[in-house]
Design a protein with these regions (language model features):
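Terminal-region recognition feature
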Residues: 1-198, 204, 216, 223, ...
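Active-site pocket-lining/capping segments in soluble small-molecule metabolic enzymes
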Residues: 224-226, 233
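Catalytic-face loop-and-helix region of soluble metabolic enzyme cores
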Residues: 239-240
Length: 528
């Protein structure tokens, strides 16, 4: 039996034909942040300087990318661009490794050196590159950085260096190791010529680079959460057979332990470095306040405004008690009032950063000055953090480090002293409290730059003297300066603390008393 089928019909389009391109949505590449595990648009990450906009994780960037982020556009002149590593030891696989890494990264070796401007300040620069064998230091890296320092010394330029490295390049044997000493010698010559060296530690900075030029800067900055270590975490864990605590050897760990001056987010590094370069050129920066370490002064007020919180004392003991008042003006308030700006620097480079001693570079009417101040704090929480103004050995060593810097760069030093005395405790003795004070006395007595010390509150014994060996010693009219507190004097000599008032009068600890004795050079009226 035959089946009927429907005839197929064909639709025919009549009229002229036109072509049109189909529109597809733009392609986006997404990256997962290893820290917060969130997905980020690659373009957004790039616009944010390769920093996760959600958690602040700083991704690694190439040396040239970092150069573009930091240097004023159109000002960079590269030095020694044609130097390239060779396999001079015939190390197995090294020649092929150099070729493949060079093709992939577009670089001849792991550092880019040159000259450029940061916020208008002329400087020599080097940028290490983790994309080339993890920034390992071989003979070419050493030679290029060494030449950069030598040129900077000849030209009278500061040096700003960005470090990233897995350490020495093993494929070049002891030649790689020798670069540590070679660069360090060049850094020393540059420093002796009065040159400023700023290092910026980025993730990771380890091994021989950490144990040489990375930690030799006059000022050391670090990106957040950057691993900085001599021995890496894996090496230590294998050695110790235990897990390391979270944050160990990271930037914040370095800051807490006194080995860097500040942790600065990537987006603020250029402006922060520009501020520091301007200050070392001998003029005040006019760039604003890029980072919390820069504080703008309050203008138009007089010192007396800070000291009219309580009635004028009548006796020596009342003066002493008033210096201890929580309402009394702090060093931070005086710095904010008296200076146009202030950049705080941290750390003694040995053990820690003592919050009781605030130190850094300030400027007034365009002129830079090194400021070292003992800070008691105001609130209970802050006073505890600052140990009630009783400095540890690391506080005095931080002060000495900043004094030496001031001498090197020809800045005057201003010390603001307000302490009941140096901290007495087991840890302070273990870390050499007496030695720290003694070294300060010797250092200040021969410092070849002007020093002015002002006793702004209580000047307690050796802890105060450690910042009071100066060309000019001043006291605020409501301050006190003594070998011992009146209460301790009465207790020790007379076994009677009720005689503290008598002891205060006998100790001659007021500003007029000490001026009459020739101990101080002048009195500053703090009552306006």
């Amino acid at each position: 039996m035959l089946m009927n089928r429907k005839a197929k019909t064909v639709n025919v389009l009549e009229g002229p034909m036109t072509e049109s391109c189909a529109e597809f949505p733009a392609r986006h590449v997404f990256i997962k942040c290893p820290e917060c595990r969130r997905v980020i648009d690659e373009a957004r990450l790039h616009d944010n300087l390769e920093v996760c906009p959600r958690c602040g994780k700083h991704f690694r960037v190439s040396g040239r990318a970092r150069m573009r982020m930091t240097v004023d556009e159109g000002t960079f002149e590269e030095w020694d661009a044609n130097l390239a590593s060779e396999d001079f030891l015939s190390f197995p696989g090294y020649a092929d490794k150099l070729k493949s890494v060079s093709e992939r990264s577009g670089e001849r070796d792991a550092v880019v050196c040159g000259r450029g401007k940061i916020c208008g300040c002329d400087t020599a620069l080097f940028f290490m590159d983790a994309n080339f064998m993890m920034g390992s230091m071989g003979s070419v890296v050493g030679e290029k950085i060494c030449r950069a320092f030598e040129r900077a010394t000849e030209l009278g330029l500061p040096v700003v260096g960005f470090t990233v490295s897995g350490g020495a390049r093993m494929q070049e044997g002891v030649t790689s190791l020798m670069q540590m000493a070679k660069i360090s010698a060049a850094v020393r010559r540059h420093s002796e010529a009065g040159g400023l060296y700023i290092t910026v530690l980025t993730d990771p900075t380890t091994g021989g680079v950490t144990a040489s030029f990375a930690m030799e800067g006059d000022i050391i900055l670090a990106e957040p959460d950057a691993l900085t270590a001599f021995a890496g975490p894996r090496v230590i864990e294998q050695n110790m057979h235990k897990r390391l605590p979270k944050g160990f050897q990271r930037s914040e760990f370095l800051l807490e332990h006194g080995f860097c001056d500040a942790v600065v987010p990537r987006g603020e590094i250029a402006l922060t470095v520009g501020e520091l370069l301007a200050l070392h050129e001998g003029h005040a920066p006019g760039l604003g306040a890029p980072h919390e370490i820069v504080h703008t002064g309050r203008r138009g007020k007089k010192l007396g405004h800070l000291f009219k919180r309580s009635a004028a004392p009548k006796t020596a003991l009342e003066i002493v008690k008033q210096t201890r008042s929580a309402d009394r003006a702090t060093a931070g308030e005086m710095i904010s009032l008296g200076l146009d700006g202030f950049v705080e620097l941290h750390g003694d480079r040995y053990f820690g950063d003592d919050a009781a001693v605030v130190a850094g570079i300030g400027w007034k009417d365009g002129r830079p000055v090194t400021v070292i101040a003992i800070e008691r704090g105001t609130t209970t929480k802050e006073r505890m953090r600052r140990n009630f103004g009783m400095a540890h050995p690391e506080g005095y060593r931080k002060a000495r480090r900043l004094m030496r810097q001031a001498e090197k760069f020809g800045r005057p030093v201003l010390c603001l002293v307000d302490t009941s005395g140096a901290f007495c405790g087991i840890g302070a003795e273990e870390r050499g409290q007496g030695e720290a004070i003694a070294q300060n006395l010797m250092e200040m007595s021969g410092l070849k730059t002007p020093i002015v010390s002002v006793v702004t509150g209580e000047g307690g014994s050796g802890g105060a003297l450690a910042l009071s060996v100066a060309d000019r010693i001043l006291m605020l009219s409501s301050s006190a300066y003594s070998v011992v507190s009146p209460e301790a004097c009465a207790s020790i000599l007379w076994k009677d603390t009720e005689r503290a008032n008598e002891a205060a009068e006998a100790l001659k600890l007021t500003a007029p008393d000490l001026l009459a004795l020739g101990i101080i050079d002048g009195i500053v009226d703090d009552r306006g």
